[in-house]
């Protein structure tokens, strides 16, 4: 009998490992992952570097850059982080209806947009863009300063992958969005059950009360935020879907955060490949997307939120792409859905968690 005792701790260890895996949050990370080293990519790293997440896959969507370019930057970052186990699925190249030409017609009538993502005529090197780049067509992938990836995206579309995962793990998958909502809108149109099968929908987007003077890129005005403006029709489809729970990180809370030179220096001291990557390519600025990930790790960082009915204006006039919202007690049209909208944050705690995640060693958690 004594010879069998060694099996007990081994079996117990296996059971505990299995329980830990089962308790992880299954998540699909959908992102307009401009790279290298932006808030977009830093938000993806939040999920990759936390032991609380089982990242089923990363899906890319045009927004801050064209999707082919974003996909390549994401694949390269996975290599640097030792997370080539995570599949990447390339998603929508264009919004459902909106287009570069449509936005230019709007500008001719109503005024200029400061920031247009992939449609921007020229990215100028400044405090939020690390290298200058002129506009290019969606099929062009410019030379990558961080190096070309050796791994490739998986076959199949982002929307197909989303549908497959919520059916495989009904009631377990958190769907997360850090960019325009095109991939999720397409998934919902292909299979309306996506909303009821998902555990929760979490997104960064919308603008409600933010002071325009405090916003340098995320909004054209206080209620027209980039992610929703880039594909308003997709946002309408997603916002009206019957999610069990929907949580929204608007720019109102994002502009209360700053990625500082001090945080960057702390991260650089770790000396890991990702720390070196961020030291070389990240720049100080608002942390647009990271809040929506870290709040899933530690909800206590959110110190204030409201229940609001959320929608978007898709009338092709002066208000196209603007956030619409009503208080939970209001009488609203029958299609609007309630969401938990974040407004206040414990910045110190948020910063500590972020720096910790960015300094962890490479490899699967």
Segments predicted by a language model, with ranges:
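A charged helix-plus-loop insertion that forms the helical arch/lid used to bind
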Residues: 105-123
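Active-site histidine-anchored catalytic micro-motif
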Residues: 23-84, 101, 121, 125-247, ...
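Bacterial N-terminal signal peptides
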Residues: 9-17
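Conformational coupling and interaction surfaces
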Residues: 23-25, 42-50, 54-55, 226-365
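Bacterial N-terminal signal peptides that target proteins for export
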Residues: 1-10
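Sec/Tat signal peptide C-region and signal peptidase I cleavage site
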Residues: 18-22
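A short, structured active-site edge motif that brings together acidic residues
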Residues: 87-95
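A short acidic, often aromatic-flanked loop/helix-cap motif at beta-alpha or helix-coil junctions
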Residues: 94-98, 254-256
């Amino acid at each position: 009998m004594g010879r069998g005792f060694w099996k007990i701790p081994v079996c117990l260890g296996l059971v505990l490992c299995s329980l830990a895996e089962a308790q992880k949050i299954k998540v699909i990370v959908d992102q307009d992952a401009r790279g290298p080293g932006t808030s977009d990519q830093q938000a993806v790293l939040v999920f990759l570097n936390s032991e609380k997440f089982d990242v089923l896959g990363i899906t890319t969507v045009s927004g801050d850059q064209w999707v082919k370019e974003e996909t390549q930057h994401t694949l390269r970052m996975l290599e640097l982080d030792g997370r080539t186990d995570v599949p990447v699925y390339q998603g929508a190249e264009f919004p459902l209806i909106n287009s570069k030409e449509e936005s230019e017609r709007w500008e001719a009538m109503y005024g200029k947009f400061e920031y247009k993502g992939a449609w921007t005529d020229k990215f100028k090197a400044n405090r939020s863009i690390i290298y200058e780049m002129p506009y290019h067509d969606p099929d062009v992938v410019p030379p990558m300063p961080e190096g070309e990836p050796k791994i490739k995206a998986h076959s199949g579309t982002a929307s197909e992958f989303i549908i497959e995962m919520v059916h495989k793990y009904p009631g377990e998958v958190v769907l997360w969005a850090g960019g325009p909502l095109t991939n999720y809108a397409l998934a919902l149109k292909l299979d309306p059950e996506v909303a009821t099968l998902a555990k929760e929908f979490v997104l960064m987007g919308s603008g409600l009360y933010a002071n325009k003077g405090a916003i340098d890129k995320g909004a054209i005005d206080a209620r027209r935020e980039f992610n929703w403006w880039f594909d308003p029709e997709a946002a309408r489809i997603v916002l009206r879907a019957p999610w069990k729970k929907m949580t929204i990180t608007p720019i109102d809370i994002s502009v209360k955060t700053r990625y500082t030179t001090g945080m960057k220096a702390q991260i650089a001291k770790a000396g890991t490949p990702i720390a070196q990557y961020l030291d070389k390519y990240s720049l100080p600025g608002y942390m647009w997307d990271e809040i929506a990930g870290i709040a899933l790790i530690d909800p206590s960082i959110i110190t204030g939120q409201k229940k609001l009915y959320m929608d978007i204006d898709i009338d092709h006039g002066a208000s196209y792409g603007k956030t619409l919202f009503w208080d939970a007690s209001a009488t609203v049209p029958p299609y609007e859905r309630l969401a938990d909208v974040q407004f206040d944050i414990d910045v110190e705690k948020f910063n500590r968690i972020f720096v910790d995640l960015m300094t962890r060693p490479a490899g699967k958690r």
